Amino acid sequence: MNTQLEPAIAAMVADFIAAGRPKASKLSWQTRREGYLASAVLGGEREEVGAIEEWQADHYAIRLYRPKCLPCPAYPVLIYFHGGCFVSGDFETHDRQMRMLCNSAHALVFAVHTRLVPEHPYPAAHDDALAATLAIMAALPQWHGDPGRVALAGDSAGGHLALVTTLRLKAAGAALPAAQ
C-alpha cells in the first residue's frame, strides 16, 4: 500500500505546518467553511458532464448530474451527501467528485446539500437527508432512474448521513437502496 501523499497535498501540509496554522478545532465555523471551499481547487479541472440541474426544497438543495453518455432507459442512481463535519461543505466543494462519479459510473448523481450546524442543530441534516432521499426516489421515473439500482453514499459526515438515512428508511418500511 502506498502511504505517500501526492506532491501537491504534501506541499500544502508542509506549508500549513511551516505557517503555524491553527488546528481546525480552534477555527470559527465560518473560517472552516471558507478554508474548505478554498481547498476545492486542489481537485484539478472539472470534467464535462451531460447536464446539471439544481433546485431548492424546503430545507435542502439538490444538484443532479446527468452523464454525457447515450440516453439510457433506466440509469443507475447515486444519492450523495457531502462531508464537512456537518459544519461545512456544499455543491462547490464536491463538484469535481460528483462529475467524476457521474461520468465513470454512467449514473445519475444527486448531490444533496443539507442544513449545516451551528445554525441548524441536530437533527436538521438527518431530516433533510431523509426527506431528499424520499423525494428523489419518488421522482426517479421522470429522470429515467432505475429504482432497483439506487445507492446512497457520502464522505465523512455525508457517509454518516448515508448510513443513518438507510437505517431510517428501513425502520419506516420504505424502499431501500440497493447499495450503501
Outline where the language-model segments fall.
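Catalytic nucleophile-loop/oxyanion-hole region of alpha/beta-hydrolase
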Residues: 90-91, 97, 110-149
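A generic structural signal for alpha->beta connector loops
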Residues: 49-51, 59, 106, 147-149, ...
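A glycine/proline-hinged amphipathic helix-loop "lid/cap" segment
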Residues: 1-67
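Primarily recognizes the serine-hydrolase "nucleophile elbow" in alpha/beta-hydrolase
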Residues: 134-143, 147-180
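Conserved HGGG/HGGXW glycine-rich cap/lid loop of the alpha/beta-hydrolase fold
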Residues: 80, 87-103
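A fold-wide structural signal in alpha/beta-hydrolase
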Residues: 77, 106-110
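Short beta-strand element of the alpha/beta-hydrolase
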Residues: 74-84
